[in-house]
Amino acid sequence: MIIKPKIRGFICTTTHPVGCEANVQEQITFTKNKGKIANGPKKVLVVGSSSGYGLSSRIAAAFGCDAATIGVFFEKPGTETKPGTAGWYNSAAFDKFAKAEGLYSKSINCDAFSHEAKQKVIELIKQDLGEIDMVVYSLASPVRRLPDSGEVIRSALKPIGETYTATAVDTNKDCIIEATVEPATEQEIADTVTVMGGQDWELWIKALSEAGVLANNCKTVAYSYIGTELTWPIYWHGALGKAKMDLDRAAKALNDQLSATGGSANVAVLKSVVTQASSAIPVMPLYIAMVFKKMRQEGLHEGCMEQIYRMFSERLYRTDGAKPETDSDNRLRLDDWELRDDIQQHCRDLWPQVTTENLSELTDYREYKAEFIKLFGFGIEGIDYDADVNPYVEFDVIELQ
């Protein structure tokens, strides 16, 4: 079939398998060009490995460190008449390229919050790898089914305490609007912590540890975003921030546990990037369009892959073997360039000046839109979007019901 982009709200409901493969290829090429990470991990589990930072982590491990990787994700395959999710095609492409280089690659399509997912991964590790020396936790799910009760909990992207009103961009109509978001209830805050906090990360490490499949020097990392006062009301000081603070709590507990055998647990605070997750957060698209333009001008721009390669090579797996630089809360800070005073001051000054008319001139809004559509495999140079493609893409994936 011929597949064209169809956008509804802040998601694109169609995806292009060839475009998604090209995205993965581009990240692999970047990683290979940067060179091998000398003392990188060799057996890596990535929970949430199909897009964004999780996918880049799997690529950095495999193509930057020659690691065997197991990827866990929850995606929909395509059929003969309907495209699957971008994450399905990304994972299929990763698997194809990894196997072509003789790298071990196993993928599990399942609910990562479930007990079954953890048991299946443990079984695979025991059978094929013996143990793992890195666990990347990169889930971005709006809902979580509690593994014991089966209850479904939903998160809320809301401020705390008071209604939040700010200048934002309507990405469907490409115009500047006033966005208003009502505050979260106490229950919504608690639910957001349950879905997006550190509980499931702890459950993964507990299950892997009790099964005896964590190597002595195993490192684990989970991803977070803090931002600045421009986005704090909706993010760090909102319900989502409470969940990310719970991730910090979990990191401390896990680090105490893993450091006893030479391992470590850290939260890595990353920069804002265009992902399906960030596009859903009010004001983030406008902020990203602003900050990207300034960072590009300063030669500091990074996408997911650049960030993760830097985290591996300059933080967790340094050539001198030294411990990574961390902040006072033991976090790895990869948002250091974004948070530079000159970059943030530029955004603060610009925010009140942006109108629908000058949006594309003052910010990188056009580039934001292009990067957004690229997530789904569209708008990529060299791909013939009028050509017939098969949306049904098979690969070596274990399906758990």
Swiss-Prot record:
Belongs to the TER reductase family. Involved in the final reduction of the elongation cycle of fatty acid synthesis (FAS II). Catalyzes the reduction of a carbon-carbon double bond in an enoyl moiety that is covalently linked to an acyl carrier protein (ACP). InterPro entries: Eno_Rdtase_FAD-bd_dom, Enoyl-CoA_Rdtase_cat_dom, FabV-like_NADH_b, Trans-2-enoyl-CoA_reductase. HAMAP family: FabV_reductase. Substrate binds at Y225. This is Enoyl-[acyl-carrier-protein] reductase [NADH]. Keywords: Fatty acid biosynthesis, Fatty acid metabolism, Lipid biosynthesis, Lipid metabolism, NAD, Oxidoreductase. Its EC number is 1.3.1.9. The keyword NAD applies. PANTHER family: ENOYL-[ACYL-CARRIER-PROTEIN] REDUCTASE [NADH]. Monomer. It comes from Shewanella sp. (strain W3-18-1). It catalyses: a 2,3-saturated acyl-[ACP] + NAD(+) = a (2E)-enoyl-[ACP] + NADH + H(+). One of its GO terms (molecular function) is trans-2-enoyl-CoA reductase (NADH) activity. It is an enzyme of class 1 (oxidoreductase). NAD(+) binds at residues 48-53, 74-75, 111-112, 139-140, 244, 273-275. The record marks E75 as: Plays an important role in discriminating NADH against NADPH. Pathway: Lipid metabolism; fatty acid biosynthesis. The active site is at Y235.
